[in-house]
Regions:
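Glycine-rich FAD pyrophosphate-binding loop
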Residues: 2, 18-37
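N-terminal Rossmann-fold NAD(P) dinucleotide-binding loop
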Residues: 10-11
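Anionic group-transfer/hydrolysis microenvironments
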Residues: 30, 41, 100
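N-terminal FAD cofactor-binding segment of flavoenzymes
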Residues: 34-75
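Conserved N-terminal helical subregion
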Residues: 65, 72-129
């Protein structure tokens, strides 16, 4: 199974495919680490990382733990979210991550599971027969 993109969705998908007993590989058009935004994870991400078998690799990096979020509106109103109030089932915390390092950690963990990651490889055409 070919997975296009080595970001979090691609690496988690590839790890789950491998866990299901299928062969897979990832192609990524850029070289890692690379700049990308989106540092704020949500607790629901933790279950996907755990199911994919990638949670321990991320834990080992020692990223900053995050237990909630605060938003200050233009009018000064404050909106606090405490993840322990269980807006969803499961984890009550997550991490704040530097995305370049986070994505590289996930890709490296996939490679350690035997999933080839081909960097600087761009998909330019697909033919389905």
């Amino acid at each position: 199974v070919l997975v296009i993109g080595a970001g979090p969705s691609g690496t988690i998908a590839a790890a789950m495919i491998k866990n299901a007993g299928l062969e897979t590989m990832i192609v990524e058009k850029l070289k890692f680490p690379r700049f990308v935004i989106g540092e704020s994870l949500l607790p629901r991400c933790m279950e996907a990382l755990e199911e994919a078998g990638l949670l321990d690799a991320v834990k080992a990096k020692g990223f900053q733990e995050k237990f909630g979020a605060k938003f200050v509106m233009n009018n000064g109103d404050v909106c606090d979210f405490n993840f322990s109030e269980n807006f969803t089932d499961g984890y009550t915390w997550t991490w704040q991550v530097p995305r370049a390092e986070f994505d590289k950690t996930l890709a490296d963990a996939c490679e350690s599971k035997g999933i080839p990651v081909h960097y600087e490889t761009e998909v330019i055409d697909i033919q389905i027969r």
